Each structure stands twice: as structure tokens, then as C-alpha cells.
Amino acid sequence: MIATHIKRHNAPKGLFSGNMNDAEISLQNEKIYQMIFLKRNLNKFIEKGDLNQSIIAQHFGTSQSQISQLLNSKIDSYTMETLTVFAFMVDSKLGLISSRDEAKQKMLNNKLALMKEISLKIKEKLKADKINQSELGRKYFNTNQSVVSEFVNEVNFKVHVSNYSYDRLRKYAYVCGITEKELDEYEK
């Protein structure tokens, strides 16, 4: 079983029924669940003697002190994106899998897929409410029209994907009302 993401993204049902404040709370909760998943599985392999913090740090491409913080539930300095990339490199039965490059590529693919989902919801909302991109950006994302236009123009997703952290995309998904089931579809 490949670890991807402990699914606790409980977006409100309905198109654009969420807000950025609740999205931030949801994201912080998701980080905790992701940390629990990583901590539980990494500690299991450490206790068996299969891994140590140094090996994990080397595999994850980070410092041993960062791994120590993770294993001690200190995740303030971690983003959801980093925790999820780490989770892509852990299998609950096999231990460490996937290289950091493979995990980062999987994250990039997930971010592009999530941008497409958000794009569909934005287009649907623009049409349904007959509002312009600036209004939608201000009202729902606390941002400007240029951000919304980047989601409307799918041709440039590969150009713009680097502008968006996974954390930010998860918050936008929450606001858009993208459900856990929809997120599961692209996170496979």
C-alpha cells in the first residue's frame, strides 16, 4: 500500500461553499494527520531496526534534525507539500520506496491535476453567478483577478504550476468545494 495522503480534507458540499479561513484550519488538520501517518510508519521501521533517522533523512533529502522534529510531532516548519512528498516515499509494508525525484514528480502531477479540478469549478462558478474573474478572486480567494485567470487558462498550467504550493492549492480546492472523493481520484 503506497502512502499518499491521510484523507481529512472535509470540504463543505456545494460549489464555492467554503472560505479561506476554514480552508486554513482544514489544511492545518490535514498536516497533523499526515504527520501521524509518517510518524507511525517510520517509527514502526525504526523499532524493527530496519531504519534510523540518518537513513530516513538521506532518503528524504533533508537533515536528521528535521526528521527528529517530525518524529517528535514538531511540524510547524513543514508544509503540507513537503509532508506529502515524504509520504510518497513511504510504504506502510515496504518501508522507504520511491526516490525524492519520483516523489516530487508525483507531486507535480498531483498539483497539475488539482489545478484542472479547480479550473473546472472556477469556470462553473463564473458561469453560474455571471461574475467576472476579479469579483470571484476577491470574494472567494482573497486575491486578485490574475490568479483566477491563471486557473481559467489551462494551456499555461505547466508555466504557472510553480507559482502555487500544494498547500495553497489544497485551500483553493476546499473553497471550491472539491470533495475528498474527487481528490482521491487524482491522488492515486
Predicted features along the sequence, with ranges:
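A short, Lys/Arg-rich alpha-helix, primarily the initiator
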Residues: 20-49, 97, 103-135, 139
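DNA-binding alpha-helical recognition surfaces that contact promoter or target DNA
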Residues: 44, 58, 69, 120, ...
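Central "turn" residue of the DNA-binding helix-turn-helix
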Residues: 50, 61, 91, 130, ...
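Residue-level signal for the short linker/turn that defines the boundary of a DNA-recognition helix
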Residues: 50-52, 78, 131-132, 167
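The DNA-contacting recognition helix of HTH DNA-binding domains
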Residues: 53, 64-65, 69, 94, ...
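The alpha-helix within a helix-turn-helix
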Residues: 57, 87, 126, 137-138, ...
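Recognition helix of helix-turn-helix/homeodomain-like DNA-binding domains
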Residues: 60-76, 142-164, 186
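DNA major-groove recognition helix of helix-turn-helix/homeodomain DNA-binding modules
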Residues: 80-95, 163-182
